[in-house]
């Protein structure tokens, strides 16, 4: 069994939750080793004038 570390991040994007998750993964790649998995914990969004302006994804990223 190979141990993994887990970091928690919030990714954000104006283009959707998938892009928000990818933004978190991209940020994690800057400091983490090999990323082996992502757990999406929560989705939220910012709203202005009745329109979604930013999608946010709280994620846990497993890495070696």
Show the residue positions of the predicted features.
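A cross-kingdom feature marking charged/low-complexity
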Residues: 39, 43-64
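Short, well-ordered alpha-helical segments
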Residues: 2-36
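A generic structural signal for short, solvent-exposed coil/turn residues
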Residues: 1, 32, 49-53
């Amino acid at each position: 069994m190979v141990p993994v570390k887990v970091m928690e991040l919030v990714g954000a994007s104006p283009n959707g939750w998938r892009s928000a998750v990818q933004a978190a993964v991209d940020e994690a790649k800057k400091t983490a080793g090999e990323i082996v998995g992502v757990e999406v914990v929560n989705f939220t969004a910012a709203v202005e004038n009745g329109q979604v302006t930013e999608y946010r994804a709280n994620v846990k990223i497993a890495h070696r």
